[in-house]
Amino acid sequence: MSKGEIMNRLATSKEDILAASRELIRENGWAAVSIRSVAAKCSVSAGTIYNYYESKAELLGATIESVWQEIFFHPEDEQVFHDVTTCISWIYERFQYGNKRFPGFFSLHSFGFMKEGKDDGKKRMMRTWGHILNGLCEVLKNDHKIRPGVFDENFTEMQFAEILFSLMLVSVIREDYDPSSCLLYTSDAADEL
């Protein structure tokens, strides 16, 4: 083992591993991520990667979660979270950014990965989606343009957020990053609620 490899082993962190994994996804799609390919990208042995992740499934789950986090980092303009229409437009912009930065990440094949018995990956994705849903709920609660009393125990902010997010996911799968349909639905629904 060379001195450079020893130094690299000591310098490798989960963040470095996830950054290398994201780079592999950008270059070759998420199927390119494996223990060996990430180790090669980090210039470390596969054993070093196994020190952090027990399996390829665990590495993929963590990588997918980190991609979602990169896509949905908090904006510099916190006003995004005070207005439902601005927030929805921002989410669509972030989906479009994610598609450009990580081509194919949102494909049905990627979503299928989460259904193949990879419980850790599915939990991580659901946690990330939960974060997005909770954010939408907060925006719905705090938007001064939403009529007071529009939500109650029969139709909650979370139920409406789930409908909106479902519409967004369908748009993403179709690679349609125009928020106008979702915004129209939001406007119509808010008027009728």
Give a label for each model feature.
Residues D16, A20, L24-E58, A62:
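Helix-turn-helix
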Residues E65-E70:
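Short, basic, alpha-helical segments at the C-terminal edge of helix-turn-helix-like DNA-binding modules
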Residues A62, E76-R101, E157-A161:
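Hydrophobic alpha-helical connector segments
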Residues H109, L164-M168:
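Short alpha-helical scaffolding segments that buttress acidic/His motifs in well-ordered protein cores
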Residues Q96-G135:
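Short secondary-structure transition hinges
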Residues M1-T12, G149-F151:
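N-terminal intrinsically disordered/low-complexity leader segments
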Residues G117-K118, W129-A161:
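Hydrophobic alpha-helical bundle segments that form small-molecule/ligand-binding pockets
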Residues Y185-L193:
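Conserved small/polar residues in nucleotide/adenosyl-binding loops
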